[in-house]
Swiss-Prot record:
<dbReference type="InterPro" id="IPR011032">
    <property type="entry name" value="GroES-like_sf"/>
</dbReference>
<comment type="function">
    <text>Together with the chaperonin GroEL, plays an essential role in assisting protein folding. The GroEL-GroES system forms a nano-cage that allows encapsulation of the non-native substrate proteins and provides a physical environment optimized to promote and accelerate protein folding. GroES binds to the apical surface of the GroEL ring, thereby capping the opening of the GroEL channel.</text>
</comment>
<dbReference type="GO" id="GO:0051082">
    <property type="term" value="F:unfolded protein binding"/>
</dbReference>
<dbReference type="GO" id="GO:0005737">
    <property type="term" value="C:cytoplasm"/>
</dbReference>
<comment type="similarity">
    <text>Belongs to the GroES chaperonin family.</text>
</comment>
<dbReference type="GO" id="GO:0046872">
    <property type="term" value="F:metal ion binding"/>
</dbReference>
<dbReference type="GO" id="GO:0044183">
    <property type="term" value="F:protein folding chaperone"/>
</dbReference>
<dbReference type="InterPro" id="IPR020818">
    <property type="entry name" value="Chaperonin_GroES"/>
</dbReference>
<dbReference type="GO" id="GO:0005524">
    <property type="term" value="F:ATP binding"/>
</dbReference>
<dbReference type="Pfam" id="PF00166">
    <property type="entry name" value="Cpn10"/>
</dbReference>
<keyword id="KW-0963">Cytoplasm</keyword>
<dbReference type="InterPro" id="IPR018369">
    <property type="entry name" value="Chaprnonin_Cpn10_CS"/>
</dbReference>
<keyword id="KW-0143">Chaperone</keyword>
<protein>
    <recommendedName>
        <fullName>Co-chaperonin GroES</fullName>
    </recommendedName>
</protein>
<comment type="subunit">
    <text>Heptamer of 7 subunits arranged in a ring. Interacts with the chaperonin GroEL.</text>
</comment>
<dbReference type="InterPro" id="IPR037124">
    <property type="entry name" value="Chaperonin_GroES_sf"/>
</dbReference>
<dbReference type="GO" id="GO:0051087">
    <property type="term" value="F:protein-folding chaperone binding"/>
</dbReference>
Length: 94
């Protein structure tokens, strides 16, 4: 897969949701919560605001937390990805 996001956009791939609760109950289908943790797979060049270039704060390979209702889901080569703006990323998980 080769995709190059524009501006301050980032392409992420969701990490898998937990299959079990802490008490051991196995979750299936819609019972699994949609994860808000993902891995960055592509990063745009950044944006320009009032003539100043705003650098991207994330890089490919970073694990991030993102806003629940953000981004656009896309499917490429049978894989599901999300394209969202850097502002929709809440934190980098270290």
């Amino acid at each position: 897969m080769r995709i190059k996001p524009l501006g301050n956009r980032v392409v992420i791939k969701r990490l898998e949701a937990e299959e079990k609760t802490k008490s051991g109950i196995v979750l299936t289908g819609s019972a699994k919560e949609v994860p808000q943790e993902a891995e960055v797979v592509a990063v745009g060049p950044g944006s320009i605001v009032d003539g100043t270039k705003i650098e991207m704060e994330v890089k490919v390979g970073d694990k991030v937390l993102y806003s629940k209702y953000s981004g656009t889901e896309v499917k490429l080569d049978g894989e599901e990805y999300m394209i969202l703006k850097q502002d929709d990323i809440l934190a980098i998980v270290e």
